[in-house]
Amino acid sequence: MTNIRKTHPLMKILNDAFIDLPTPSNISSWWNFGSLLGLCLIMQILTGLFLAMHYTPDTSTAFSSVAHICRDVNYGWFIRYLHANGASMFFICLYAHIGRGLYYGSYMFQETWNIGVLLLLTVMATAFVGYVLPWGQMSFWGATVITNLLSAIPYIGTTLVEWIWGGFSVDKATLTRFFAFHFILPFIITALAAVHLLFLHETGSNNPTGIPSNMDMIPFHPYYTIKDILGALLLILILLALTLFTPDLLGDPDNYTPANPLSTPAHIKPEWYFLFAYAILRSIPNKLGGVLALLLSILVLIFIPMLQTSKQRSMMFRPFSQLLFWTLIADLLTLTWIGGQPVEHPYIIVGQLASILYFLLILVLMPTAGLIENKLLKW
């Protein structure tokens, strides 16, 4: 008799996705991050659900409701810090996952890649509206600064900003709608992730060599289930260490001051995972130009499959491209550092140079390296 997992309509879907899925035999630990992102999403939804049970999305009580969660709710402090640091782990996994895709040419699965970019944007939106909810100083001023960027849009900008605010400033209406967005978006992310997986399973996984692996596949279970569990345990270990030893390491001390529209913090800056984009935004002295550069810094990912000039898919055997890839990583780290620094010399010029280099690497240097490597193949 055929196993129920292969015949039952629901079990069959799970079986084809996680058990009998043919997987390349040589994929490395860089392929772990997909499942780790799934784990992060589940953790964030669960911790977020329990936080929402005690949180009040109202300007007069939001800050004290978070304090109440940390002080009075059983293990509330733990749930709150798991959720806050879980977001950081989510972005670490996201950036590693995207980096893997860039390095090994996974972006050639175009539908999967484009949905991935959409997922990145949705997760970023979720993190942004979530950061506003504790209603501390950085929450309030972060919301004010970032929503204000939309006023750079010609003609409709100001109206659009006031429409998003639900008034003439960031206030009660803004907080309430941001809570609504923060609650609904993770479920949209879950649906998008399912579509992401659907398209991936149409083609099967890429592998480090970038060469088709149809002739050498192994079942996902038990080989990669056990490998993913190791990754998951490491992720949980790091998250627990962060949460239990240094819960505020990645946060901003300003957010422990209740929001005050009459007092601006000395340095307004987002969470660490947005600093690279924030640095690109600040490096352009024109408001609209900065907003466009900010958008393009993420949307440039969509153009990457079109910029593939190399005959080889992966960078595994392409030393020039490897050099440029790691230069890009160093550049992103530089931008992240600059985003957290005040706007003064020498940070301004370093930020501008790093921003130029970011776009130059992706749009010009890497495609050129691909062409040069094609020539070298003929030698």
UniProtKB/Swiss-Prot annotation:
Q: Which UniProt keywords apply?
A: Electron transport, Heme, Iron, Membrane, Metal-binding, Mitochondrion, Mitochondrion inner membrane, Respiratory chain, Transmembrane, Transmembrane helix, Transport, Ubiquinone
Required cofactor names? heme b
The Gene Ontology biological process terms listed for this entry are: mitochondrial electron transport, ubiquinol to cytochrome c
Q: Which residues bind heme b b566?
A: H97, H196
Consequence of substituting L323F: In strain: Isolate gulf of Mexico
> Does Mitochondrion show up as a keyword for this record?
yes
> GO terms for CC?
mitochondrial inner membrane; respiratory chain complex III
Classification via InterPro entries? Cyt_b/b6_C, Cyt_b/b6_C_sf, Cyt_b/b6_N, Cytb/b6-like_sf, Cytochrome_b, Cytochrome_b_C_euk/bac, Cytochrome_b_N_euk/bac, Di-haem_cyt_TM
Query: One GO molecular-function annotation for this sequence?
Result: ubiquinol-cytochrome-c reductase activity
Provide the transmembrane region boundaries: 33-53, 77-98, 113-133, 178-198, 226-246, 288-308, 320-340, 347-367
Alphabetical list of CDD domains matching this protein: cytochrome_b_C, Cytochrome_b_N
Key word Heme present in the record? yes
Cofactor binding notes: Binds 2 heme b groups non-covalently.
Question: Where is a ubiquinone annotated to bind?
Answer: H201
Q: What else is known?
A: Heme 1 (or BL or b562) is low-potential and absorbs at about 562 nm, and heme 2 (or BH or b566) is high-potential and absorbs at about 566 nm.
Q: What does the record note on quaternary structure?
A: The cytochrome bc1 complex contains 11 subunits: 3 respiratory subunits (MT-CYB, CYC1 and UQCRFS1), 2 core proteins (UQCRC1 and UQCRC2) and 6 low-molecular weight proteins (UQCRH/QCR6, UQCRB/QCR7, UQCRQ/QCR8, UQCR10/QCR9, UQCR11/QCR10 and a cleavage product of UQCRFS1). This cytochrome bc1 complex then forms a dimer.
Under what name is this protein listed?
Answer: Cytochrome b
* Organism whose genome encodes this protein: Tursiops truncatus
- Originating gene: MT-CYB
